């Protein structure tokens, strides 16, 4: 999911993904990571169709040279080492988007899954608050949240999720995303349930 795009949502839905990945952002953390996963083109196309029908600009891509990013590769390394799951990667880190676009995309994602006949797990990779520590210090604080304020708000968000208090969470989401440099990019329509 950590795939930055400048416009619209993009779905990478090749039949097969394989390569050796090194992060452009932090090559000293993630480097020379070999990967090979099966994809699910039908699901990817369905996601794009449902989202576009909901008014969210979305494109499905089956381009062999369109590689996976670490937001997909890192979770797959730990959860799909046996290639048990098919992979579809969604660019949900849009440089210019609204939270309502993200909400509608989440609802369309759910619709696309429900229209299929398989079992699907959705993994949202990223973080809650999302601000790296100051330059030259990432290793020193690699396992820490960069600011205590962000940590406290993140803990509150997790509590709201555990309680199923989607109404309160959705009400605070715009400020949370802004004030905590949020990487929470879309929500499903769980608040309607």
Predicted region positions:
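Internal, conserved structured core segments that host functional sites
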Residues: 45-99
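Active-site beta-strand/loop microenvironment that shapes enzyme catalytic pockets
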Residues: 93, 97-147
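Short, well-ordered beta-to-alpha junction loops that form the rim of enzyme active sites
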Residues: 1, 63, 124-128
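Feature marks hydrolase-like catalytic cores characterized by long aromatic- and Gly/Pro-rich stretches
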Residues: 165-185
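Conserved small/polar residues in nucleotide/adenosyl-binding loops
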Residues: 186-193
């Amino acid at each position: 999911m950590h795939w930055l795009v400048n416009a619209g949502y993009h779905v990478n839905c090749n039949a097969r993904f394989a390569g050796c990945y090194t992060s452009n952002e932090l090559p000293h953390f993630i480097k020379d990571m070999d990967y090979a996963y099966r994809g699910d083109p039908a699901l990817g196309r369905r996601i794009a169709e449902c989202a576009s029908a909901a008014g969210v600009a979305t494109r499905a891509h089956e381009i062999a040279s369109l590689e996976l990013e670490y937001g997909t590769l890192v979770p797959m390394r730990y959860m799909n080492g046996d290639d048990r799951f098919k992979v579809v990667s969604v660019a949900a880190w849009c440089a210019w988007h609204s939270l309502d676009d993200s909400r509608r995309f989440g609802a369309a994602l759910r619709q696309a899954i429900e229209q299929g006949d398989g079992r699907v797990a959705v993994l949202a990779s990223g973080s809650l608050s999302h601000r790296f520590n100051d330059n030259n210090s990432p290793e020193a604080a690699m396992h820490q949240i960069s600011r205590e304020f962000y940590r406290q708000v993140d803990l509150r968000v997790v509590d709201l999720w555990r309680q199923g208090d989607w109404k309160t969470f959705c009400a605070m989401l715009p400020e949370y995303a802004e004030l905590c440099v949020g990487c929470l990019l879309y929500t499903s329509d769980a608040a309607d349930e």
